[in-house]
Amino acid sequence: MNYELSKRQFLAEIKRFVPKDRIYTDELRTLGWGTDASFYRQTPQVVIRSDGEEEVSRIVRACRKHRLPFTFRAAGTSLSGQSCTDSVLIVAGKHWERYEIIEQGESLHIKLQPGIVGARVNEILKPLGRVFPPDPASIGSAMVGGIVNNNASGMNCGVHANSDRMLVSARIVLTDGTILDTGSEASREAFRRSHPEFLSRIERLRDKVRADEELRARIIKKYRIKNVTGLNLRPLVAYDDPFDIIAHSIVGSEGTLAFLSEVTMKTLRDYPYRASAMLYFLSMREASEAVVAMKGLMAGEEDLEMSAERLVVKSAEMLDYKSLSAVDDPVFLQYRQDVDAGLIANAGPGDYRHLTAIITETKTITHE
C-alpha cells in the first residue's frame, strides 16, 4: 500500500465535510498532538478535531476505505501511550461536552459525551447530592471518554464502582461507521436487522465461554479484583443480552473496538463526612493482616446505594519503608527504627454518627 497516496485521497475526501480549520497536517501541530501523559511519542500524520458522531462515522468509514489506522483521543492523560499514533488521530474534546440528568426513581443517572472532564461531572452532580463514581487521580483533567475507555477507577471506587459496574448503556460508532445506541430499543432493533451475524457471533462467544467452567470461574475471580489488562471479558459471564455485552466490552478497550460518543452512567450518593488515617505497622505482614481485617468489614457490592450506609473502610493503600522514607513524615521519622510499613485508610462516606462509629471500629481492628 502506498501510504502517502492513501493519505492524500483520505484528506481530499474528509475535506468535503470537515472544515479545514479542524484538520491539522502541519509539522508543528501534529508534533504537539504527538504525545500524551506517558513518555511515548508518535507524530500523527493527520489530526482531526471532530464535531459530532455523524462526522466521526464518516471519518471512520474514510479511514477504513483508504486503509489508514486511526486512534481516538480525549484529554490525553493516559500513561501508557493509548492516545498516541503515527497515522490518523481523531480528537473528541471540545464540542463533546453535553450532558443530561436522568431521574430513575430515587437514583439518578447521567448521560455524558466523551469530552466532559470528570471533575466537571462532579460539579454538576454536587447540588443534587450525587457523585460520579470513578475517581482516577487525573479526574481534574481526564475526560469521560478516556475514563470509561480505560476503565479508570482510582483508589476509592475499587471494582465495586468502576466504569464497568456503573455503566448503564453506551452510544458507539463501530469501525464500519454504524451508530449503535444500546440504550435505545429502536437502535437495537435496527442493529439486529443490519448486523445479525455480528450479534450471533457475540452470543456464540458468550455461550462458549460459559460452557468452559474453568474459564468462567477464572474470569469471575479475575474481575473481583482490579484487572484492566487487555479487553474486558467480564461482560461475557455477567450479561445475557448481547447489547449489554457490547456496551460493557467498550469499557477498558482503549478505543480499539469502537468510538464512544455517549455513555449513560449510574451515580452514587455524595455524603458530607469522610475520615482518613495514616496507620503505621512494625512489618508488611502486620499491615497486610490489617487490610484483610478491614476488608472483612467492607459492605458487599450487591446494592451500592444501600452498601454506602454499611461501609466501614472504603479504601486502604499500603506504603513500604522506602516510600515512607521518601516523604520524610515527622511522625514516621520519630518511630523509623520500629516502623516498616504504613497504610493510608479512608473511611466513609456517611453521616457524622455513622462515621464516628466507623473510626472506633477501625481503631479496634488495627490495634488487634
What are these regions (language model features)?
Residues I147-N149, N156-H160, L167-E368:
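C-terminal substrate-binding/cap subdomain adjacent to the FAD-binding core in PCMH-type
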Residues T77-S78, S138-V148, S253:
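Conserved A3 ("GATE") glycine/threonine-rich loop of ANL adenylate-forming enzymes
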Residues M1-K65, A75-L108, A137, H160, ...:
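N-terminal flexible segment immediately upstream of the FAD-binding catalytic core
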Residues F70-F72, L79-S80, V121, A277, ...:
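Extended, hydrophobic alpha-helical segments in both membrane/secreted and soluble proteins
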Residues I14, S38-F70, V88, A92-P136, ...:
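N-terminal glycine-rich flavin-associated loop
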Residues E27, F72-G76, S83, P114, ...:
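Glycine-rich, histidine-containing beta strand-loop boundary motifs that form or position
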Residues F10, I59, V121-I124, A287-A293, ...:
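Hydrophobic side chains in well-ordered alpha-helices
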